[in-house]
């Protein structure tokens, strides 16, 4: 696929975000696109953001549940980039600033050392992690009606939107991440729940997968990076006036309000 086509698709996605008007399914219009093309498209928009003063502060891992992988016909996760502008600081965001937001409860890793592939292990991840904490990711799609396949979501920065971290910082060696339980509430009503093992069996394994996959692109996970390790339960559509709380055993709570 030509770089010209990559640029056209990247521009269409960027305009969709800017104007809050989603585009049609990319993989329908360009059926010959491969996953490597999709990552190149993703990077075009990320590089532009960085050039404009919006730095990369971490990564997110998507498609970590077997059910979602089966739905999209893939057998591996994907990844996207977290930018400084994506972090929610005050616990509230404007619903109108997003297209089709959905909420997920996740375990976040914050690194104290770099992690390099291609042979990173769970042990390497735990040793390189400063702390783990509760997180809510707001996924969003620039593709109309969330009508996505693997190519579409990868090109669209793994359907990234925004995220918020909890305040409790836990040494990963002090908690069994696989057994951490999460309950997601909307307006104080329990919506769904999940455990750490829901993401490929172990959130730390997901981060190791990411480090090893990034090695193929010449990228290393860096000290200070925030890594969102994958949704512990199904994503939930969000609307103005709703407040979400993800409550984790060991890791505490994190709350987000849509205005």
Q: Where do the protein language model's features map onto the residues?
A:
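A short beta-strand-loop-beta hairpin characteristic of the jelly-roll/cupin
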Residues: 120, 212-217
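Conserved phosphate- and dinucleotide-binding cores of soluble alpha/beta proteins
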Residues: 194-198, 206, 216
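Short, charged beta-turn/beta-strand-edge "cap" motif at the junction between a beta-strand
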Residues: 115, 232-236, 250-253
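Buried hydrophobic packing segments
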Residues: 45-46, 165, 207-214
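Catalytic-core "active-site belt" of small-molecule-metabolizing enzymes
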Residues: 2-201, 243, 253-259
């Amino acid at each position: 696929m030509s770089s010209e086509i990559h640029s056209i698709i990247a521009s269409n996605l960027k305009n969709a975000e800017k104007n809050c008007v989603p585009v049609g399914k990319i993989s329908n219009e360009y059926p010959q696109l491969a996953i490597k093309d999709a990552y190149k498209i993703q990077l075009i928009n990320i590089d532009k953001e960085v050039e404009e003063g919006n730095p990369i502060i971490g990564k997110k891992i998507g498609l970590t549940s077997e059910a979602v992988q089966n739905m999209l016909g893939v057998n591996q996760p994907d990844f996207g980039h977290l930018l400084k502008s994506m972090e929610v600081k005050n616990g509230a965001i404007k619903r109108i600033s997003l297209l089709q937001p959905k909420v997920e409860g996740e375990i976040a890793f914050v690194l104290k050392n770099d992690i390099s592939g291609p042979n990173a292990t769970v042990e390497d991840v735990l040793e390189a992690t400063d702390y783990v904490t509760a997180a809510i990711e707001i996924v969003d799609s620039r593709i109309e009606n969330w009508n996505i396949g693997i190519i579409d979501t990868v090109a669209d920065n793994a359907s990234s939107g925004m995220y918020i971290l909890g305040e409790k910082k836990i040494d990963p060696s002090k908690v069994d991440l696989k057994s951490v339980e999460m309950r997601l509430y909307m307006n104080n009503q329990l919506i769904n729940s999940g455990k750490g093992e829901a993401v490929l069996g172990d959130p730390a394994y997901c981060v190791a997968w990411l480090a090893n996959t990034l090695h193929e692109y010449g990228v290393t996970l860096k000290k200070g990076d925030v890594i969102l390790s994958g949704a512990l339960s199904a994503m939930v559509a969000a609307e103005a006036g709703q407040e979400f709380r993800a409550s984790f055993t060991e890791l505490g709570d994190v709350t987000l309000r849509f205005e």
